[in-house]
Amino acid sequence: NGKTQTTAPDVSNTQVGVSMFGLDYRYVNGRISSRGQYISATLSDTEAYNVAGSKDIGSAMMGYYLEGAYNVLPIENKQKLDLFVRYENFNTHQETAGSLVANDAYHRNEMTYGFSYHLANGAVFKADYQSKGTAVDGADNKGQINMGVGVFF
């Protein structure tokens, strides 16, 4: 009969519209590379959704990142070892609607330091350290170590 035992609020009569704009760039010159992205989104009818579902979705969001990398291996090698640094800033409460007050904990920034070892075309091993913070005064930054293997074709 389609019924479930969920205790989640019923938000089936609310619809949130999304309009998004983004810019992306990539630059490579010899051993140096850089990339970045900027995204801005506006959401409509968030006030009705927030009231119906006891949620706190912002009506506008914004985020960007900038990354720079340097390949420390000789340029003629097929393998690459990129040392990189990346800064990210994103705010999912850039704007809020109705009585919802912007939550500074949703305005986050991250600094990432790491390396990408490109074993062959389409295969990479990555490791990095991330320091994560928010716009909340006195909030403790959190750090984490990430490792992964990527395969692409």
Where are each of the predicted segments found?
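Outer-membrane beta-barrel pore domains
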Residues: G2-F153
